[in-house]
């Protein structure tokens, strides 16, 4: 039996780097050697809060190289560089017909695995992709695109879905609260849609990066975001506010910064039990809309990949910290408590 290294979740916040069986492709599926896997907050929440039964191998922001093919696979050959999405819908059910792909039963099944209960598998040297992932959720990486950039196709997809859920039109003013890696992606994608984008954060490093990427910035440590937004919008407020920060304070600032009839997307609120107080009477009287959105969409899959591969969304500057698999716990610790200059944390399997 061939073995590989993997960071296995066994119920503790500390992952165990172990040797486990190398996966084999099923008919129509394939095995991918992982190059880089981004550390995502949804996985860290599952680890920290014990939201998923062990054992599992997490990691779903994946770029790698096709290693082995199952019978009947024609789209790829061994050696092809690919991005693999871990969730892909059936495109035939009630929810798919409504374009609510994240509610599809097949979508909810994780389609990539390094072993155990499927959970992404990117924190391992190899993973297997199910046939529907190979058919509709694997994307070739063009020559010249770095693996640490390519692995961000999946989060860019989720952010583009959020931006489009806010129905942003050219010439509108959009506020993004928070300028971590997700906030930066939201800012850049709103710019792609033609918006003038105002952003806020507490970190001087992140605000400086946002300015270099074309955002108009506000230091949230000073307070007064709502007043600043009104000054920047001739007293009206933002057409849409995208939340890339958690907590009652940022949520209140988002609601207060939105014009009457505007849209609020609480993109960062992905944990069940994450509750905020809101004055529904005030919200209704001003006809402000809270727009819920979750996960990725096949509708923007091709465009999201093109935005990443073409460099129209600048991502190289976001990947600030890369760790070998042997230091996966150090990587997750840095994600939990980022340094002043930390943006995106990644596991680079090529480092050992």
Model-derived segments and spans:
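C-terminal hydrophobic helical "lid"/dimerization subdomain
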Residues: 1-6, 252-256, 298-352
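Residues located in well-ordered beta-strands
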Residues: 5, 16, 21, 33, ...
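Glycine-rich beta-strand-centered segment in the early N-terminal region that forms part
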Residues: 23-37, 50-97, 142-144
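NAD(P)H dinucleotide-binding glycine-rich loop of Rossmann-like/cofactor-binding domains
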Residues: 92-177
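Mid-domain Rossmann-like dinucleotide-binding core that forms the NAD(H)/NADP(H) cofactor-binding site
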Residues: 143-223, 227
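Glycine-rich phosphate-binding loop and adjacent beta-alpha segment
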Residues: 248-310, 346-352
């Amino acid at each position: 039996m061939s073995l590989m290294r993997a960071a296995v979740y066994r119920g503790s916040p500390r992952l165990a780097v172990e040797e486990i069986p190398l996966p084999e492709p099923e008919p129509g599926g394939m095995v991918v050697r992982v190059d880089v896997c981004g550390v995502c907050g949804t996985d860290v929440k599952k680890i920290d809060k014990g939201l998923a039964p062990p054992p599992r191998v997490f990691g779903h922001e994946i770029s790698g190289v096709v290693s082995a093919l199952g019978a009947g696979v024609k789209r790829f050959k061994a050696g092809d560089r690919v991005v693999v999405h871990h969730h892909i819908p059936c495109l035939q059910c009630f929810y798919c017909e409504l374009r609510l792909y994240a509610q599809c039963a097949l979508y909810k099944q994780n389609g990539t695995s390094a072993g155990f209960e499927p959970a992404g598998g990117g924190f391992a040297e190899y993973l297997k992709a199910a046939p529907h992932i190979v058919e509709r959720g694997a994307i070739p990486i063009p020559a010249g695109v770095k693996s640490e950039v390519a692995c961000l196709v999946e989060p860019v997809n989720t952010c583009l879905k959020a931006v489009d859920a806010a129905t942003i039109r050219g010439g509108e003013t959009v506020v993004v609260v928070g300028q971590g890696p997700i906030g930066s992606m939201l800012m850049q994608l709103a710019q792609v849609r033609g918006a003038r984008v105002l952003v806020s954060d507490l970190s001087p490093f992140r605000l400086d990066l946002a300015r270099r990427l074309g955002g108009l910035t506000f230091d949230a440590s000073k307070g007064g975001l709502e007043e600043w937004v009104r000054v920047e919008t001739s007293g009206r407020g933002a057409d849409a506010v995208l939340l890339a920060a958690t907590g009652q304070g940022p949520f209140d600032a988002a609601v207060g910064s939105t014009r009457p009839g505007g849209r609020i997307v609480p993109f960062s609120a992905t944990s069940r039990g994450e509750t905020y107080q809101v004055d529904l009477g005030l919200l209704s009287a001003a006809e402000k809309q809270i727009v819920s959105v979750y996960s990725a969409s096949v509708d923007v899959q091709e465009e999201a990949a093109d935005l990443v591969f073409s460099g129209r969304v600048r991502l190289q500057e976001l990947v600030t910290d890369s760790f070998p698999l042997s230091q996966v716990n150090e990587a997750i610790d840095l994600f939990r408590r980022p340094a002043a200059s930390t943006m995106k944390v990644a596991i680079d399997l090529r480092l050992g």
